[in-house]
Amino acid sequence: MALTSSSQAETWSLHPRASTASLPLGPQEQEAGGSPGASGGLPLEKVKRPMNAFMVWSSVQRRQMAQQNPKMHNSEISKRLGAQWKLLGDEEKRPFVEEAKRLRARHLRDYPDYKYRPRRKSKNSSTGSVPFSQEGGGLACGGSHWGPGYTTTQGSRGFGYQPPNYSTAYLPGSYTSSHCRPEAPLPCTFPQSDPRLQGELRPSFSPYLSPDSSTPYNTSLAGAPMPVTHL
């Protein structure tokens, strides 16, 4: 009898029973074993929020939909799962709601000091972008935007048609801040001693004025210089 008992002990030691850690766990056991409270000692910043009813339901549905549609994007899967969740009734949602309550109670028990703090996304300040006011400064009065090497051919090409007597002083090549505001045209005067100019101007106004008219225009035709306006 002693020999048989020793042989059974040796056989038992050679073939130990499978440990519980190697056995497949259900979803609840996996969640419990993988919870931060079971591992212990995690800071509160790394603790995740407890799942709600939709997350409990979609954790299985998402995996199935991803297997059926491997090329579907994750955002599209979430959109379809949200539409399906809205179509479910209260009776169908009840087991997932109860499971979410159980997870919330255990999360509160494991982390009594936990408080949800949403992380703010850091806004990257874009450097190198020139403000519009600085860029448009050269366009306002034609300052350094055109540059000194801007020729008259480029100016005529940019401004369209250029008349033959177009002054090159107003082209962008020499366009400075002093030309931002146009100056008033100077009145043109003719010499009083030239009888040809007076003779050409008088007949043009004679049909419109009577000989007996005492308007100030008659006095201007007598010999005073008359400004020429723009036609």
From Swiss-Prot:
Query: Where, per the database record, does this protein carry Phosphoserine?
Result: 35
Drop me one GO molecular function for this one: DNA binding
N-terminal signal peptide: none
Region Interaction with FHL3: start-end pairs:
136-181
Quaternary arrangement and interactors, per the entry? Interacts with HAND1; the interaction enhances HAND1-induced differentiation of trophoblast giant cells. Interacts with POU5F1 (OCT3/4); binds synergistically with POU5F1 to DNA. Interacts with FHL3; the interaction recruits the transcriptional coactivator FHL3 to the FOXK1 promoter.
Instruction: Provide the residue span(s) of the region labelled Required to promote HAND1 transcriptional activator activity.
Output: 1-45
This protein's major location comes to nucleus
Q: In which tissues is it expressed?
A: Expressed in myoblasts (at protein level). Expressed in embryonic stem cells (at protein level). Expressed in myogenic progenitor cells (at protein level). Expressed in the ovary. Expressed in kidney, liver, skeletal muscle, and testes. Expressed in lung and skin. Expressed in the brain, heart, diaphragm, and intestines. Expressed in the conceptus tissues of the placenta.
Task: Extract one GO BP annotation from the record.
Answer: myoblast development
Ranges of compositional bias, category Polar residues: 1-11, 211-221
Cellular localisation: Nucleus
Question: Could you tell me the keywords of this UniProt record?
Answer: Activator, DNA-binding, Nucleus, Phosphoprotein, Repressor, Transcription, Transcription regulation
Q: What is this protein called?
A: Transcription factor SOX-15
Segments carrying the region annotation (Disordered) are 1-45, 111-136, 186-231
Null mutant phenotype = Knockout mice are viable, morphologically normal and fertile. Reduced regeneration of damaged skeletal muscle fibers following injury with increased numbers of mononuclear cells and a significant reduction in the number of myofibers. Impaired proliferation of myogenic progenitor cells, reduced number of satellite cells within the tibialis anterior muscles, and a decrease in FOXK1 expression.
Q: Which sequence ranges are marked TM in the entry?
A: none
PANTHER family linked to this entry: PROTEIN SOX-15, SOX TRANSCRIPTION FACTOR
Q: Is ATP-binding there in the keyword field?
A: no
Residues of the DNA-binding region: 47-115
- InterPro entries from the xrefs? HMG_box_dom, HMG_box_dom_sf, SRY-related_HMG-box_TF-like
Function according to Swiss-Prot or TrEMBL: Transcription factor that binds to DNA at the 5'-AACAATG-3' consensus sequence. Acts as a transcriptional activator and repressor. Binds synergistically with POU5F1 (OCT3/4) to gene promoters. Binds to the FOXK1 promoter and recruits FHL3, resulting in transcriptional activation of FOXK1 which leads to myoblast proliferation. Acts as an inhibitor of myoblast differentiation via transcriptional repression which leads to down-regulation of the muscle-specific genes MYOD and MYOG. Involved in trophoblast giant cell differentiation via enhancement of HAND1 transcriptional activity.
A GO cellular-component term linked to this record: nucleus
Q: Does the keyword Phosphoprotein apply?
A: yes
